[in-house]
Amino acid sequence: MTATYSDIVNEVLINLQGYTMQQDRATSLSAAVSSTTTTTISVTSTSDIGKGIIEIGEELIWVENFDRVGNTLTVAPWGRGYLGTTASTAAISSKVTISPTFPKYVVKRAINDTLRAMAASIFAVKQTTFTFNPAVTTYELLDSGGSNLTAQSIIAAHWQEVGPSKEWIPVRRIRLEPFADITTWGGSAASPAQTVTVHDYITPGRTVKVLFAADPGTLSSDSDVFTTATGLPLSCKDIVVLGATYRLLTFLDPARASQTSPQADEIDTKRQFGSTSSIMRQIYALYTQRLAEEVKSLQQQFPTRIHYTR
């Protein structure tokens, strides 16, 4: 079983909507949006549309006027790519969400913010290899394509024994340099190269494998597979969902503050201001509990191993 970026976005959205209890109004495009500067949009129905925000794909658009006879919308001159979203084209029959409670753009941002925050507690396990040269003690951390790798710490290192035994012998003396000299290794102050220095005896020409901890990666494309892009096990997916959910719920009450609009006052008579906060705290508690469980599991799988740095 795999989970993609799109799957996680949909799971966050359906949780926030109470499965099917709350549904945003929607319609469809009756003609493709073929340009990122188009200011006239044709839809199948304008019965639920008014002046304000619509969402097509991940783009937010500000609608200035609408024609209920011709089912067309007129976008404000500044209305494409509204609120920092990216203006994009859209195919005919694409979904048009009217005043989305949680825009996909914001949901995706919350997911990646959660992944970055998790880096303080949990790490992705990665590995790289290099061929040992007895004349060289220091090696740059590079992936198979020659790009720099970024490590938090070294978990373990082994080298492949000579002969048919297929044994990988632990490297006892190895040191990580997270900010290698720019003059020697290149890179920059913002993105320095990282190196490992080996002080053990290793048979020349043998492969050395370094297992290291790294920050979880973020997601970008809808088709990105969670485990591949982040480096985390699939069991961490629900942590990301819970983290994104509590982040999004945090900002519901400020939108209903009494100084915002008369409509907010009317809503407050039915649902007290601050009611969202208690729900958010419950979800945050679940998030921290699951994160602690996953941290413990990771520590059991990769216990601290003693190695010398010199």
Task: Show the residue positions of the predicted features.
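Short alpha-helix capping/helix-loop boundary micro-motifs
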Residues: 38-44, 83
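Glycine-enriched, solvent-exposed interface loops adjoining structured elements
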Residues: 1-33, 47-82, 86-310
